[in-house]
A protein has these predicted regions:
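Ordered, amphipathic secondary-structure segments that act as subunit-interaction surfaces
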Residues: 4-14, 19-22
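Short amphipathic alpha-helix with an adjacent loop that forms part of the alpha/beta core around
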Residues: 1-3, 77
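General beta-strand structural signal in soluble alpha/beta enzymes
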Residues: 12, 35-40, 87, 113
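A contiguous loop/helix-start segment that scaffolds small-molecule binding in enzyme catalytic cores
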Residues: 3-8, 84, 88-117
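Class I SAM-dependent methyltransferase SAM-binding "motif I" and its flanking Rossmann-like core
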Residues: 21, 25-81
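Alpha-helix capping/helix-boundary segments
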Residues: 15-16, 43, 93
């Protein structure tokens, strides 16, 4: 490390830093600070590989908006998606989200879930 050089270390106890969490906004792009990722456990890849669903094409949706029209719009767009989709859902919203997914996606869609607490 050179004198005056900026080094940022981001450690997450909730998966890979910068993937689907609030820490994504902390990344260093705006300040032109190089980022060197060190791969670790990732909920997206774990869910995809354990699901048994198609892995050749998938969409990572992440967390949906909490309320209102933007949430419904995003879910309606997802209802028309043919690829495997991965959503992050908070544990206390899990049952409500499954009901919502079932009502919008229909009974012909397979909804597979992993609950990570």
């Amino acid at each position: 490390m050179k004198q005056g050089e900026v080094v940022v270390l981001l450690i997450s106890d909730a998966g890979t830093p910068g993937i689907g969490g609030p820490d994504a906004e902390l990344l260093c792009m705006d300040e032109n600070i190089p980022v060197t990722p060190i791969p670790g456990p990732c909920g997206v890849v774990s869910a995809l590989s354990a699901s048994g669903l198609a892995t050749n094409e998938y969409t990572f949706v992440g967390f949906l908006p909490r309320h209102g029209p933007s949430r419904k719009e995003r879910l309606m767009a997802s209802a028309n998606e043919a690829r495997t989709q991965i959503f992050y859902v908070l544990p206390h919203k899990f049952s409500q989200s499954l009901k919502e997914f079932s009502s919008l996606f229909g009974v012909s869609r397979y909804i597979w879930h992993i609950l990570i607490v």
